[in-house]
Amino acid sequence: MPRSTKKGPFFDHHLIKKVESAAGSKRPIKTCSRRSVILPQMVGHTIAIHNGKNYYPVVINENMVGHKLGEFSITRVFKGHGGDKKSGK
């Protein structure tokens, strides 16, 4: 169920402050706030999103606006389904 439109998008205020202060910087902005919605002010910035173990840099473009940061940094590694347990005779 999506968030109510009258509430508006959720974002952490400390993240917006970091984006505004890093206007001309090329360094990635580190954040653990996977729940924040990508706003138009973030377009063009590189944000390093924490996945629980590492920070993965993601360059924000216009198509990502409205999505959450966590959608672009996967947390689980799929190693395939279990193979056939029979020996290959």
From Swiss-Prot:
Matching entries from InterPro entries are given as: Ribosomal_uS19, Ribosomal_uS19_bac-type, Ribosomal_uS19_CS, Ribosomal_uS19_SF
Query: One of this protein's GO BP terms?
Result: translation
Gene Ontology molecular function, alphabetical: rRNA binding; structural constituent of ribosome
Q: Does the keyword Ribonucleoprotein apply?
A: yes
Q: What's one GO-annotated cellular component?
A: small ribosomal subunit
State the PROSITE patterns in the record: RIBOSOMAL_S19
Q: Which SUPFAM superfamilies match?
A: Ribosomal protein S19
Q: Which UniProt keywords apply?
A: Ribonucleoprotein, Ribosomal protein, RNA-binding, rRNA-binding
Q: Looking at the keywords, is Ribosomal protein present? A: yes
Q: Which Pfam families match?
A: Ribosomal_S19 (PF00203)
User: What is the protein's known function?
Assistant: Protein S19 forms a complex with S13 that binds strongly to the 16S ribosomal RNA.
The family this protein is said to belong to: Belongs to the universal ribosomal protein uS19 family.
Q: What is this protein called?
A: Small ribosomal subunit protein uS19
* Source organism per UniProt: Xylella fastidiosa (strain 9a5c)
